[in-house]
């Protein structure tokens, strides 16, 4: 319903691709179309006191960076917000910003928490949650899809995985929604800092409670596991609980809200979903490609390397733009069309390589459950107010999407 102004390629030298305001208030499709065609490995010059950085926009080049563990690292941060401001304080502790042997060891520990038994339990609860939210929305007739539907689906799933007490879940939702994004351009940055630290403090207390216990949830796994005979450091335990909570809640929430908006804006695809003309697994992949809940990934070059003819020097900050790679014309037919029957669908929504999203299966389950529930229970969707986009340079989604929903 809202129409954001489009940024022209002629303005490329004036804009800052690390700006949350830019991503919230403007459409950048023409910018990335230009970059893919003419400047696929682009150097954004320093802006005021902010360092310059590389912008990688083509699918093939994004793939190359993701695979290259020899020349690129996440240990200084995996997003521009941290890479350009001195690095990530969780470096070497949280899986997403750890490389090498320790990354492999911690990933193996966390993988045990995503067991088939646990995921089967979550899948059953997940569909019940989705159906309940949709039925409640249908009874009211109008709702905010972002707040009344999308917010509770991934929150419930990741909290089930971590066995977060139900009484604490809304509190954590309020924190995660402000840890990496804000609802307003002028929201003080201290809000984000406070939210992140409150999440860490919460998990510090929960880990202490579960140390020495026999529960099988992910928090207990981190609290009690050993690697080469030694327990994880307290910082590793807290940082990985934090990473699971943020990754499991934020990205799923934005993917679901974006999917609902896409179905409203593309009535032919809504009909295809309702009529059973598309496979739900295939539709899930297109929803994930289209919504791009994470705009980019970040790396720092550890050595000189050439990407698509451009020399990247050791120490340079590199950003790989999932939002652009997922619309690459050389990989996807009609990439600017939302097509639930699209196959193959080689999107980068869950990244790639050694840092491929550990919770990818859970994320797919969430979107699948929403599509399934919409197909079975909902007759029509209509947007009745302007959507409100979040302010973030890493996350892409809405904090509000008012809709009318009928059976």
From Swiss-Prot:
Q: Does the keyword Heme apply?
A: yes
Tell me any Pfam family this protein matches: p450
Q: Name one GO biological process term.
A: cholesterol catabolic process
* Swiss-Prot/TrEMBL keywords: Heme, Iron, Metal-binding, Monooxygenase, Oxidoreductase
The source's superkingdom equals Bacteria
**Cofactor names:** heme
What EC number(s) has UniProt assigned to this enzyme? 1.14.-.-
Molecular function in Gene Ontology? cholest-4-en-3-one 26-monooxygenase activity; heme binding; iron ion binding; monooxygenase activity; steroid hydroxylase activity
Q: Does the keyword Iron apply?
A: yes
Amino acids binding heme:
357
Q: In which pathway does it act?
A: Antibiotic biosynthesis; novobiocin biosynthesis
* Role noted for this protein: Together with NovH, involved in the formation of a beta-OH-Tyr intermediate in the novobiocin biosynthesis pathway, an aminocoumarin family antibiotic that targets bacterial DNA gyrases. Acts as a cytochrome P450-type monooxygenase with specificity for the tyrosyl-S-NovH acyl enzyme (L-Tyr-S-NovH) to form the beta-OH-Tyr intermediate (L-beta-OH-Tyr-S-NovH).
The family line of this record is: Belongs to the cytochrome P450 family.
Protein name in the entry: Cytochrome P450 NovI
Task: Name its species.
Answer: Streptomyces niveus
């Amino acid at each position: 319903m809202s129409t954001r102004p489009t940024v022209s390629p002629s303005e490329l030298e004036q804009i800052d691709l690390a700006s949350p305001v830019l991503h919230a208030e403007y459409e950048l499709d023409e910018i990335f179309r230009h970059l893919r065609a003419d400047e696929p490995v682009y150097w954004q010059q320093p802006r005021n006191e902010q360092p310059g950085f590389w912008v990688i926009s083509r699918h093939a080049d994004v793939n190359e960076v993701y695979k290259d563990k020899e020349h690129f690292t996440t240990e200084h941060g995996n997003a521009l917000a941290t890479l350009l401001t001195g690095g990530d304080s969780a470096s070497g502790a949280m899986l997403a910003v750890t490389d090498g042997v320790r990354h492999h060891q911690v990933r193996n520990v966390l993988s045990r928490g995503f067991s088939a038994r646990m995921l089967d339990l979550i899948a059953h609860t997940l569909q019940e949650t989705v159906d309940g939210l949709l039925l409640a929305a249908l009874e009211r007739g109008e709702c905010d899809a972002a707040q009344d539907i999308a917010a509770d689906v991934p929150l419930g799933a990741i909290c089930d995985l971590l066995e977060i007490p139900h009484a604490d879940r809304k509190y954590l939702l309020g924190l995660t929604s402000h840890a990496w994004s804000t609802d307003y351009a002028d929201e003080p940055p201290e809000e984000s800092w406070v939210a992140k630290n409150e999440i860490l403090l919460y998990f510090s207390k929960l880990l202490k409670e579960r140390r020495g216990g026999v529960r099988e949830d992910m928090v207990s796994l981190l609290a009690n596991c050993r690697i080469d005979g030694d327990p994880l450091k307290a910082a590793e335990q807290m940082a990985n609980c934090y990473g699971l909570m943020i990754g499991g809640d934020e990205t799923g929430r934005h993917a679901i809200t974006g999917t609902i908006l896409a179905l409203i804006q593309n009535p032919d695809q809504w009909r295809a979903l309702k009529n059973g003309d598309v496979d739900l697994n295939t539709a899930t992949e297109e929803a994930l490609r289209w919504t791009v809940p994470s705009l980019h990934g970040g790396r720092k070059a550890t050595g000189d390397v050439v990407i698509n003819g451009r020399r990247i020097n050791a120490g340079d900050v590199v950003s790989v733009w999932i939002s652009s790679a997922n619309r690459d014309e050389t990989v996807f037919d009609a990439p600017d069309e939302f097509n639930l029957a699209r196959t193959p669908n080689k999107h980068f929504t869950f990244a790639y390589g050694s840092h491929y999203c550990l919770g990818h299966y859970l994320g797919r389950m969430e979107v699948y459950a929403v599509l399934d529930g919409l197909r079975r229970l909902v007759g029509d969707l209509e947007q009745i107010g302007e959507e409100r986009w979040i302010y973030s340079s890493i996350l892409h989604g809405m904090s509000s999407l008012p809709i009318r929903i009928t059976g």
